């Protein structure tokens, strides 16, 4: 699960943390636990988050 270097705080639309799996579904990018308002948990390997601006916009 590669952490995107362009991740910015405050642009998270939704997120979830994973324990075993390290693959983020389509539309989500990997992010460090410190980038999300989530209590530190050593059981978590990381988080997947959907960011504002990364969602594909419908073509007009």
Swiss-Prot record:
- Domain of life, per lineage: Eukaryota
* GO MF term (any one): toxin activity
Q: Cellular component per GO?
A: extracellular region
Kindly list the residue ranges recorded as spanning the membrane: none
Where in or outside the cell it occurs: the entry states: Secreted
The alphabetized UniProt keywords are:
Disulfide bond, Secreted, Signal, Toxin
Where expressed (tissue)? Expressed by the venom gland.
For this chain, the Swiss-Prot or TrEMBL PTM comment says:
Contains 3 disulfide bonds.
Q: Which family does it belong to?
A: Belongs to the scutigerotoxin-02 family.
The molecule here is called U-scutigerotoxin(02)-Tl4a
Per the UniProt entry, what species is this protein from, by scientific name? Thereuopoda longicornis
